[in-house]
């Protein structure tokens, strides 16, 4: 299939498809060009079949369209000389189609999928960094962007469309990538965007409240994540045994690797396991001692907080399960770097320690505050807000958490979007026992500045919610704004 051809592409599904040379594959009629294959799916917002005339006018070579309500599965029609092949359940088949189109890229590198509410980005980055230190050419795909380490290009969604994912992977293979760590979102699993990928390993970090505006309730959210193990080629399963959902899944996955820092492992029950035996937190990170099926060791980590110890142990267990030697992993561990905007520490002489983190769920905020507290000798400040046009139920929960775990809560705007900023802040304050104690400043830069300038040298200021993002969405406008740049400027350091 080196010269992409419609007949070869559809061979497993439509034996009598016509022969047509194909250039690119796209779901977007606006970018469809001469010689392309236009795939007309029925999505949540639009029916791609309405754009078939536009794609034909732009010179596409062939069209594959959803059959439901239009034609029978495998039916071939012709419109203005362009073959239109109808397939039923096209969304479910899209990953496999794109995989064939791009020559099955997940067969040509080691692909590790990471799913869970929190920790996906850090765990994927640690996997990519660590494998690269051991000689792989490593890449990441996810929230921060896609690409080879150090050459990551920002993206809109955690998991792109099924076609985007295969296309990106093929591009990485073309750049000689040998290892890729990919964040796998619950939306991506439900919408079959990674359905045909062959994962060498699949990591589960944890499950807590998020995306309930999409999934409806926690049971549906858990079911969405479980799809990675039940419906996909998941390879080695690496599961966080400290998470209640993780423990449930371990009971269903006898060959999985159980990972714990809270002694939730009985070596007699789990075939392969890794657990922390002692963790000492200090100014610049943590010293972690562990035992495992592969042997014991000690790691010096530059990452802050208990959950980052968990992320590091998950990455370590994954690489051990994939056959990387323990001695080599221990030798390179001290060279692992924190991830941009994930418990990222900014310091300057005589100034408070400032930590920028992406925490935007109740659980993540609690963990970030607990993590910052481990490294805090003075007062702990928390600057945060909640996004507009998103799950409103989490706002009072986050207010309550900030009040309980921080000494000073500063409530500000996050991405208000089309909601009234003050209404969002009021929802947050409603969760506090004594809202009068919280400082309220709608302007985010002003709120961050106020906290950093008022905090003392041995205080820690956690700026939560935006992490690596370099924009703020107000109304329908995307404004330039970065917590990292704001903090760096205040401390006189480089972001």
Curated annotation (Swiss-Prot):
Binding residue positions for ATP: 116-122
EC numbers for this chain: 6.3.2.13
Motif mapping: Meso-diaminopimelate recognition motif: 414-417
Cellular component GO terms held in the UniProt record: cytoplasm
Pathway involvement of the protein, from the record: Cell wall biogenesis; peptidoglycan biosynthesis
Identification of the protein by name: UDP-N-acetylmuramoyl-L-alanyl-D-glutamate--2,6-diaminopimelate ligase
InterPro entries linked to this entry: Mur-like_cat_sf (IPR036565), Mur_ligase_C (IPR004101), Mur_ligase_C_dom_sf (IPR036615), Mur_ligase_cen (IPR013221), Mur_ligase_N (IPR000713), MurE/MurF_N (IPR035911), UDP-N-AcMur-Glu-dNH2Pim_ligase (IPR005761)
An individual GO BP term: regulation of cell shape
Chain's gene name: murE
Post-translational modification: Carboxylation is probably crucial for Mg(2+) binding and, consequently, for the gamma-phosphate positioning of ATP.
Modified residues (N6-carboxylysine): 225
Positions of meso-2,6-diaminopimelate binding: 390, 414-417, 465, 469
NCBIfam families in the record: murE (TIGR01085), PRK00139.1-1 (NF001123), PRK00139.1-2 (NF001124), PRK00139.1-4 (NF001126)
Binding positions (UDP-N-acetyl-alpha-D-muramoyl-L-alanyl-D-glutamate): 27, 29, 44-46, 157-159, 185, 191, 193
Location in or out of the cell: Cytoplasm
Family: Belongs to the MurCDEF family. MurE subfamily.
HAMAP family cross-referenced by the UniProt entry: MurE
Cofactor: Mg(2+)
SUPFAM superfamilies: MurD-like peptide ligases, catalytic domain (SSF53623), MurD-like peptide ligases, peptide-binding domain (SSF53244), MurE/MurF N-terminal domain (SSF63418)
Protein function: Catalyzes the addition of meso-diaminopimelic acid to the nucleotide precursor UDP-N-acetylmuramoyl-L-alanyl-D-glutamate (UMAG) in the biosynthesis of bacterial cell-wall peptidoglycan.
Chemical reaction(s) catalysed: UDP-N-acetyl-alpha-D-muramoyl-L-alanyl-D-glutamate + meso-2,6-diaminopimelate + ATP = UDP-N-acetyl-alpha-D-muramoyl-L-alanyl-gamma-D-glutamyl-meso-2,6-diaminopimelate + ADP + phosphate + H(+)
